[in-house]
């Protein structure tokens, strides 16, 4: 929620707003999606955040075995997925997961 609130919590700025913006941006060409290397070739990369292509300013945290935090500021929704998926390295898993989270955001977001 801290990132969705631009670094503020309960009216107090905890992290600089510009740092938050920079951390979820792919300003350098080599950080933008798509890129040639795996893993996650469909996603750009910020400061420990994976950034899907699109215009909704989404960003994701991806952990091992299919764990995700999906944040969509445009739809004002955060989706957290925990799990122990042994096939987490399956081809197109990231693309499918982002599509799934986008459907959730479209259905339940603002």
Where are each of the predicted segments found?
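Active-site-proximal binding-pocket segments
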Residues: 1-25
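Active-site-proximal alpha-helical segments within enzyme catalytic domains
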Residues: 1-8, 67, 72-83
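Sec/Tat-exported extracytoplasmic proteins
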Residues: 3-7, 27, 53, 82, ...
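Short acidic-hydrophobic sequence patches enriched in Asp/Glu that either
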Residues: 15, 41, 96
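Active-site Gly/Thr loop motif
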Residues: 24-78
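A short acidic/small-residue loop/turn micro-motif
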Residues: 85-87
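Short, gly/Ser/Thr-rich active-site loops of penicillin-recognizing serine hydrolases
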Residues: 90-110
């Amino acid at each position: 929620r801290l990132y969705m609130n631009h670094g503020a919590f309960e009216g107090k700025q905890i992290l600089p707003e510009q740092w938050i913006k920079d951390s979820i941006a792919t300003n350098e060409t080599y950080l933008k999606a798509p890129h040639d290397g795996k893993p996650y070739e469909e996603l750009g990369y910020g400061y420990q955040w994976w950034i899907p292509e699109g215009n909704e300013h989404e960003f994701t945290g991806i952990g091992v075995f299919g764990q995700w935090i999906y944040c969509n500021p445009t739809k004002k929704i955060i989706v957290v997925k925990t799990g122990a998926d042994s096939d987490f390295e399956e081809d197109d898993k990231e693309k499918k997961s982002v599509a799934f989270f986008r459907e959730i955001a479209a259905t339940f977001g603002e």
